Amino acid sequence: MPFSVSWGILLLAGLCCLVPSSLVEDPQEDAAQKTDTSHHDQGDWEDLACQKISYNVTDLAFDLYKELADLSQTSNVLVTPTSVAMAFAMLSLGTKADTRTEILEGLNVNLTETPEAKIHECFQQVLQALSRPDTRLQLTTGSSLFVNKSMKLVDTFLEDTKKLYHSEASSINFRDTEEAKEQINNYVEKRTGRKVVDLVKHLKKDTSLALVDYISFHGKWKDKFKAEHIMVEGFHVDDKTIIRVPMINHLGRFDIHRDRELSSWVLAQHYVGNATAFFILPDPKKMWQLEEKLTYSHLENIQRAFDIRSINLHFPKLSISGTYKLKRVLRNLGITKIFSNEADLSGVSQEAPLKLSKAVHVAVLTIDEKGTEATGAPHLEEKAWSKYQTVMFNRPFLVIIKDDITNFPLFIGKVVNPTQK
């Protein structure tokens, strides 16, 4: 039986913090909006191959979501598909033969249509676009390799991961599992502003290499948001469970669409710096229908069907997270060899056979009233509110957040319980 050194890959798709902006006008912010040059970046994404890869990753987003949702119908779901795709695409640089093919095809890429070099080139452009200095999206991306002190990596692998994926490499002693765990966790805490702590809970002494990939997102709504008041209201987790949660109440004009095929309301919120969130609220007992029928093409059709309407919106404050061991999920998507003794990672290191033993993914989503302005006289307001359609996000709903420049999906998830961490 050949000797096999297992190593862990830690996929961190860190913080998504959706913070509505205040009503206080910021002259610099308004000027920046008027002179926002980010639309000039659109030309970078006229490349049909890169557009195709964005479609592939969006399809992967729905695949990942459905796999994770099937694991538990009673828990929140949150995943960052672009982060997962980039981490495994980067890892594929060190794989060969069937292991490499399986990873890239598992990411929904058609290798007969798209050259492998183009895949990495497009992901490089995604990283550059998401890190563009002129954006006020406040989105930070990065990755780091933690390499066992006794292990020498192939130079071309280090060079390619640094050039294409801006990856760093740090030496670490995995034999001292506590020290290694602390070093990785400190790195994650620092890069995410301590929003994600104690990510790594266990490490094996035979771990040789770990990959940490993260996305940190802090968005401001373009439309000035005003919470007339925050009320504690019921949220229907399921048919038998109702919890009390703070609800942000707002009467205003929104991009909203009533989708009959999905039996759902779809609310769009645009963010300063070119990102859009879609909140999809199915009718009671229709979540199964939404999950079954929602596809990327359907979402595209919805984006062309939005109306600007005045509604009375009730939206819960929430802070949810998702932590997943991706091994089972990726196996269901056809990525299996890299987890087995048949894995070919000789492009990473030629010192000993390697296989992937751990793949952990973490995402965090927060929505609250920070930066909003509360107003008085709620009883007078309520008279006016009765004239408008009320849309209450008081039951499970989906959320999809995408980057408008690259069209890559940043987050996809389901809110089942706004209070469930």
UniProtKB/Swiss-Prot annotation:
The record marks 385-386 as: Reactive bond. GO terms for molecular function: serine-type endopeptidase inhibitor activity. It is found in: Endoplasmic reticulum. Expressed in the liver, leukocytes and testis. Also detected in brain, colon, uterus, esophagus, spleen, trachea, kidney and lung. Pfam families: Serpin. Coiled coil: none annotated. Keywords: Endoplasmic reticulum, Glycoprotein, Protease inhibitor, Serine protease inhibitor, Signal. Glycosylated. One of its GO terms (cellular component) is endoplasmic reticulum. Changing residue 330 to P: In allele V1 and allele V3. The keyword Signal applies. It comes from the Eukaryota. Its main location: endoplasmic reticulum. The keyword Nucleotide-binding does not apply. Glycans are attached at residues 56, 110, 148, 274. Residues 1-21 form the signal peptide. InterPro entries: Serpin_CS (IPR023795), Serpin_dom (IPR023796), Serpin_fam (IPR000215), Serpin_sf (IPR036186), Serpin_sf_1 (IPR042178), Serpin_sf_2 (IPR042185). Interacts with CANX and PDIA3. Belongs to the serpin family. The reactive center loop (RCL) extends out from the body of the protein and directs binding to the target protease. The protease cleaves the serpin at the reactive site within the RCL, establishing a covalent linkage between the carboxyl group of the serpin reactive site and the serine hydroxyl of the protease. The resulting inactive serpin-protease complex is highly stable. Putative serine protease inhibitor. This is Alpha-1-antitrypsin-related protein. The gene is SERPINA2.
